Amino acid sequence: MIRHAFAPVHEPFADSLALPRRLESATAARAVAITFDDGPHPDGTPRVLEILAAHRAQATFFVIGEQVVRRPELVRRIAEEGHSVQLHGYRHRLQLRLTAGQLRDDIERGTAAIEDAVGASPSLHRPPYGIYSSSGLEIVRARHLRPLLWARWGKDWRKFTTPDRIARRVLSGLRAGDVILLHDADFYSSKRSHERTAQALELIFTELRSRELDTVLAL
């Protein structure tokens, strides 16, 4: 089954499938988009929001529906503080293991959870693990959701990584217009990984300032 996977961060595959990894707007000339997957998390998300506020930065949160249902107040806070709330799915499951019916249900339930929490529908979708099945991609596009992957990632879910390594992975080769992937939750990764992410985020903002790069929403 895995041979049918689409490689999201391998440029030729992503580009051939029209899966964006970079910003398309005019604001991308001097900006990057920081995105967070897997939340909302009771500890990780508030800490990330505090750091974003301290740096007057904007970010996009790809949330998991089952976590939204548990903590709708956190999702409302994300939106109220000027960030974007987008869809990562209702559950964190690999699309290749799901039927078309299961995929449709996952996307519909995830969308409904966001709508109930913030009163608005998501416009972007990112699949768990960054992998679309052919059915999943077709369903997402049929619902007028735009896929968005990433150009740089910190691999911050790993158990033995460090804030410095996370920051270096993000910043190495980073250029204006790139979409950055980080995680504000540890539901589907190593325990308390979001703490390292928060520390890495401070390092990332220090370097973004030195490069005169702003942050924008991934819209």
What are these regions (language model features)?
Residues 73-74, 96-105, 133-138, 191:
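Metal-dependent catalytic neighborhoods of phosphoester/phosphodiester hydrolases
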Residues 13-27, 69, 191-219:
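C-terminal domain-boundary segment and adjacent tail
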Residues 36-38, 63-65, 87-89, 126-129, ...:
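A cross-domain feature marking catalytic cores of carbohydrate-active enzymes
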Residues 4-94, 102, 106-109, 113, ...:
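Active-site beta->alpha N-cap acidic-glycine motif
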Residues 93-98, 156-158, 187-191:
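A short acidic, helix-capping loop that chelates divalent metal ions and anchors anionic groups
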Residues 103-107, 161-168, 194-201:
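Charged helix-capping and loop-helix junction motifs
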Residues 131, 137-173, 213-219:
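His/Asp/Glu-enriched short active-site or ligand-binding loop at hydrolase and phosphoryl-transfer sites
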